[in-house]
UniProtKB/Swiss-Prot annotation:
Protein known as: Urease subunit beta
The species this protein was found in: Jannaschia sp. (strain CCS1)
Localization terms from the record: Cytoplasm
Top enzyme class: hydrolase
Presence of the UniProt keyword Cell cycle in the record: no
Pathway given in the UniProt record: Nitrogen metabolism; urea degradation; CO(2) and NH(3) from urea (urease route): step 1/1
Amino acid sequence: MIPGEVMPADGTIELNAGAQAVTLEVSNTGDRPIQVGSHYHFGEANGALDFDRDAARGMRLDIAAGTAVRFEPGQTREVRLVPYGGARRVFGFNQTVMGDL
């Protein structure tokens, strides 16, 4: 074994298996690109993004940890969101929740 070496198991890894996902259409109405990270509370994402924020409350992107989705100015795309797990408490971000979901 080499220090830092990753030795994954055989087969396919399924992210967020069994999570109740929703798909939303999101439009960047701004004049700058917007990037949203994998674990950002999507309901509190940049105000220039136009989407159903109520449906996105308590949700994050269904993408690999440490990655992000970029929305170019004027771009509309669908994103898949999954619920936060654990205690389902959110703090920080744009401070619109600051506690239990």
